[in-house]
Amino acid sequence: NNNYGIEIDIRERNDEIIISHDIPINDNFISLDKLLLIYNDIGKKLPLLFNVKCDGIKDKTLSLLRKYSIENYFLFDMSIPETVQYAKDNLVKFLSRVSDIEESPILLDKAKGLWVDSFYGDYPSFSFLEKYVEQNYFLCFVSPELHGRQKKTFWIKLREWLKSKDLKRNTVLICTDKADEAYLHFNHDLED
């Protein structure tokens, strides 16, 4: 009953696209087909971010997205050879990556935005992203608690940077396990 998007890990099993971070060892998973049916039944068109966990599922995934008329989505984290295939298809909305170990996003000219991550600590500033903001790229930040680190300082710095850039809310997302806290933190005093 919230207005949050969903980050979903997808992979293939027995010729079907399923929701699973790891390769499943049993049949305890939900299919992407069923999840999209539920998503459509809810009636909200909230963002869906698909973390692609295996190669070769682009066409099946796009077919399911078309079946349910899903347009507010992004695919990301494909292998580099797979990203090349996604970039060749102008119908695909994919995110390139930038992180503390991936300084130059690949195929950015074909991407709709950036998945912004940091594996070894928080960024000292977000100034390196300004060129992407100026080019109107969508940004999705990975919150530090997903890597086992504290989120408070990162969230404070990110909020200050976002306010200084006057970014539209629909151009920036944060991937977090603390969605309610994030909503309050990033929207407090911003609604005035």
List the model feature ranges, each with a label.
Residues Y4-R13, D77-V84, S104-D109:
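Short charge-dense sequence patches
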Residues N1-D55, S63, E71, L75:
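An active-site metal/cofactor-coordinating segment within enzyme catalytic domains
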Residues I38-I42, L64-Y68, Y86, N90, ...:
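Alpha-helical structural signal in soluble globular domains
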Residues N14-D15, I19, N28-L32, G56-K60, ...:
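Active-site-adjacent beta->alpha loops and helix N-cap segments on the catalytic face
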Residues G5-I10, I19, L48-V52, F76-S79, ...:
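Long, contiguous hydrophobic alpha-helical segments, chiefly transmembrane helices and signal peptides
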Residues S96-S99, S104-D192:
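C-terminal active-site rim and adjoining tail of enzyme catalytic domains
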Residues V52-S104:
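Hydrophobic, well-structured mid-protein blocks that either form specific transmembrane helices
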Residues N2-Y4, G43-L48, S69-N72, N90-V92, ...:
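Short, well-ordered coil/turn segments that N-cap beta-strands
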